[in-house]
Amino acid sequence: MPSTGLDKKPDSGATDLAALDTHLIAPPGVARRVFEQLRAPAEGAGFEIVRVRFGVQDGQTLQIMAERPDGSMTVEDCAELSRMLSALLDVEDPIPGEYHLEISSAGIDRPLTRPKDFERWSGFEVKVGLSEPLSGRKRFRGILQGVEDDEVLVECDIEGFSEPQVLGLPFRQLSEAKLVMSDDLIRESLKRQGPVNDDPDAPADGE
């Protein structure tokens, strides 16, 4: 599918999306270190880590979003993963001092962090932020059209065009991306996943 080339810089070469698979999952620092330590054990237990965040406001907190390969994540799954990761973190000890561990599903209006997320949820509305402006903008909202080469395709309204345009947003420049809550998204999420913990603020807690 063609995309507009508004204010795009020349590409320095093809980008391997597999190498970009972590920059939205876990930023450099504690979160990235934790992700790299826990990714393989989590996958071995049948889970995929969607996002890792570490914050220090109101005490140190480690937040991990995860799901099964089919996108499902029950309350029981959260509890199981919390027990497993708590034990691993006690051994690896990647965070100095005391901290609070929170395990949750990605929720319905979920963050999109991996190339396959953008393919899986093609056709639904998204909000995307960029680290660098494209055509003078850093934020876009439109209908996700999947991934092509090293770009995420989003159909959105652009000033100067009478019809919505499909923009190619460089994956390496994405700073955030998430689905927009809608009735269609709720129905599709329930259809695909079955019962799901759709409240990321109601995590399974660990020590």
Swiss-Prot record:
UniProt-listed CDD domains: YlxS_C (cd01734)
Localisation: Cytoplasm
Alphabetical UniProt keywords: Cytoplasm, Ribosome biogenesis
Principal place of residence: cytoplasm
A matching Pfam family: DUF150_C
Signal peptide: none
InterPro entries cross-referenced by the UniProt entry: Ribosome_maturation_RimP, RimP_C, RimP_C_sf, RimP_N, RimP_N_sf
GO biological process, one term: ribosomal small subunit assembly
Function: Required for maturation of 30S ribosomal subunits.
Family, as annotated: Belongs to the RimP family.
Entry protein name: Ribosome maturation factor RimP
Species of origin: Parvibaculum lavamentivorans (strain DS-1 / DSM 13023 / NCIMB 13966)
Taxonomic lineage from the root: Bacteria, Pseudomonadati, Pseudomonadota, Alphaproteobacteria, Hyphomicrobiales
